[in-house]
Amino acid sequence: CIRDRVRYRQVMGDECEHLLTLSNRVVMLTEIDRGELELHKEEVALRPLLRDIAEKYQLKAAKTIHFDIDCEEGCSVYADAFCLHEILSNLVDNAVKYSNEEVLIILSGKKTEDGTIVRVHDSGIGIPLSEQHKIFNKFERVASGSRKTGTSGFGLGLNYVLQVVSAHGGMVKVESMEGSYSEFTLQFPLR
């Protein structure tokens, strides 16, 4: 049936994209570990980037996702555009995966006198306080979240986020309440 073929092509395309993303992350983590990561920093317009990521996830999600983008026009981040897209996509992907059937994701950005703050806030299942200290470790996964949502993975995503933001001279922090929300805050310096 033609509909089945179209769906199979879509699934194959999605899986190829996932494999490419994972490969890129492994390569970049290896470069970071060796001290060889080259960042090509530039001023990246944040609002259009957040909007593009939101649209991508709304199109491909099987869940009902509501996005709220809270970012002034003209807000920018001095960062490697590819890396910034990858880490924000990773955080949104986690927000979608570790949520119930309907989720609100708030993407926000704000310029400060010290740099730019970017937040990804979701109304998902949250992260138990007892496991929050482990989530940025390589190959670490929060067991309770995987069991609740049936998701799988390698536990590289949040370590990747931390390493890339750190390579930019920034910081990452998480605030979460189990059963309620998670919020990841990325702080990037001015230059």
Question: What is the predicted role of each segment?
Answer:
Residues 127-139:
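Short conserved segment of the HATPase_c
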